Amino acid sequence: MLPIKPIQPYPALLLQKKSERVLVVADLHLGWEALLIQKGVHIPSQTPRILDKLLRLIKKCKPTRLLFLGDIKDAIAKVEMEEWRDIPNFFETINKKVPDIQIVLGNHDGTLEPLLPETVKILPTTGAVFGNFGLFHGHAWPAPELLGCRNLITSHIHPMVAFRDPMGFRMTRQVWIKATCDGKRLAKSVLKHSSGKVAANPSTLLRDQFNVEPKVSRLFIMPAFNEFLGGRPINERRRGKNAKSRAFIGPVLRSGSVNIDNAETYLLDGTFLGTVSQLRKFG
């Protein structure tokens, strides 16, 4: 069983601490249809469907806070017309249901702030802490303070598993990933990035500079809330030089501190599929 509480069968989780109930979702990529339109594929906006799913989830969970773990919008360097049209209304609607909304910025969110109500709080790409959980999007290094949490929660890669039948037909399914994490090795990488120093004893440096005792032992990767997106099949075999590091995006997954081969995979309904290494023969 997972020590976090995914809301089955949604790609969302609920974190609780006393009277606080934080609903966490990630990777909405609102306005993603604009990219298809530019390629000559015209489909209706899917934002109303995503909004309806989120409203049903809010009604079910009754959160006191809603935390978005990055990539609200889809266009990276600009704001598309569809985003100007859809995103303000999206947040005004959910803000009426949940007054406390926070967003950890993702790599697609550089021009997001002008589209948001003033009541929405923007958090840095380095993430945030809630109880014993450190949450960050995953395209950038987490803040050193997050290393004082036992569990890290990230998103960004839209994790999926791929299956091929005997005829060669391929299908994919969204999954949750639960992996063990070498906290000291991760701390060494984070400190090298944040301070430029290679620490012989990262635990001591964390305590001295950030008053943090490194505790990280697990990392969870959330599936994308937007079910229409593609994903990264984590069980596909890759060949060639540095194949393992190229299989993942984001500095933490490439740091060597996360044991992906033995990571557990779960479908959205909670079904345990096996470890990543066990599933590679099906990819």
Where are these regions (language model features)?
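Extended recognition/assembly regions associated with phosphoester-bond processing machinery
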Residues: 1-283
